[in-house]
From Swiss-Prot:
Location of region: Disordered: 174-197
Lineage: Eukaryota, Fungi, Dikarya, Ascomycota, Pezizomycotina
Subunit-structure text: Heterodimer with alg14 to form a functional enzyme.
Protein name according to UniProt: UDP-N-acetylglucosamine transferase subunit alg13
EC number of this enzyme: 2.4.1.141
């Protein structure tokens, strides 16, 4: 059985972001996902249900040109998106290879995805006033944490996200608040060899 590889797209629950939903469901982007080994595209479309429903009418499962990718969507989950983000997280025991999250540039979403160690494409919503999302996305990309993109450039951003994944593998492991602090190499050597400060 092949491992699943999930691309999860989220627009958040408060503001409409039609352009990102359209771009994520664009045939060229779905094809790019399939070509990069993705098995699932999950779209949290928020207030943009009409766009998703129109996609389903235009591309019912039996008439889709994509045979190796499952496409599904939902409006929002009251319990949050942590479980959906986890679907894009590599977990060999669950048959998942590392996927990707594409998100509006909400700071809460960005922090949660970064904590989970999942490659992230951040797409600021240009319709928001006082667009702090653009500045946040640019700074995080400049520091090498995310891929900042415009919704019209998702195919190119997908390629950049795969490069980001390779760089992330060299990062130290992410420690969540529920994990014990592991001793540093210095602490282990001190304990084993009797070094005293």
């Amino acid at each position: 059985m092949l491992a699943t590889k999930v691309c999860f797209v989220t627009v958040g629950a408060t503001a409409s972001f039609e352009e990102l939903v359209r771009a994520a469901l664009d045939p060229s982007f779905v094809t790019a996902l399939e070509e990069n080994g993705y098995s699932h595209l999950l779209v949290q479309y928020g207030k943009n249900a009409v766009i998703y429903e129109n996609f389903l009418k235009q591309y019912p499962p039996e008439r889709r040109p994509w045979r190796r990718i499952n496409i599904s969507g939902f409006s929002f989950h009251e319990h949050g998106l942590g479980g959906d983000f986890a679907l894009a997280q590599a977990d060999i025991s669950k048959g998942r290879s590392g996927g990707l999250v594409i998100s509006h540039a909400g700071s809460g979403t960005i922090l949660e995805v970064l904590r989970m160690g999942i490659p992230l494409i951040v797409v600021p919503n240009p319709s928001l006033q006082d667009n702090h999302q653009e500045e946040l996305a640019r700074q995080l990309q400049k520091q090498g944490y995310v891929v900042a993109s415009h919704y019209q450039n998702l195919c190119q951003a997908l390629h950049q996200a795969e490069q980001l994944r390779a760089r992330m593998l060299r990062w130290p492991p992410v420690r969540g608040p529920d994990q014990k602090n592991q001793p540093t190499l210095e602490q282990v050597m001190s304990d084993e060899m009797g070094f005293v400060d």
